[in-house]
From Swiss-Prot:
Belongs to the SPP1-like scaffolding protein family. InterPro entries: SCAF. This is Capsid assembly scaffolding protein. Scaffolding protein involved in the icosahedric procapsid assembly. Coassembles with the capsid proteins to form the procapsid, in which the scaffolding protein is found within the external shell of icosahedrally arranged capsid protein subunits. In a subsequent step the scaffolding protein molecules are released from the procapsid. It comes from Lactococcus phage LL-H (Lactococcus delbrueckii bacteriophage LL-H). Keywords: Viral capsid assembly, Viral release from host cell.
Amino acid sequence: MERKFLTDLGLNPDQVNSIMAQYGKDMQEYEGLEAERDALKKTSSELSSKIEDLKANSANVEELTKQIEKLKSDNENATKQLNAQKLDFAVTSTIKDFGAKNAKAVKALLNHDDIRFDSKGNLIGLEDQLKSLKDSDSYLFAEDKPAGKPIQAFPTGNPVAGGKDVSLHQKIAQRLKG
């Protein structure tokens, strides 16, 4: 996200700074989760390669079989952990997309047993829960504020820059002259 984009949308500098600060926090959290995910992927691939190495070197079959079973178990655990993290990241991301003010509070109110990925990798069961939660506990979510009318500084409207309108200063000077 770039400051110029937000400025072009008509946001003032304070609003842009606030948005950029929150965006920076979200990106740090996202990068931390990505690093953790990558570490789990690396662990999973290392365990898979160790399993293959043990299969190739079958000097002591019984001991190697035990090691293979242990590595398979470790690999399954790492895969489960990776999938759980992937699901957690997707849930957190979707909660933020729904405009939650506090993702942890919203996440605590969800039934995680009903949330899962389908065969195409899409989340199932989360959107309905978030919609019903947004209806019942709307205070947890940011309001969608419609764009309001601009404030008029003058009762006849704001003067047009470079227009024929006489400035307020000139009107006061004319009134004082008589």
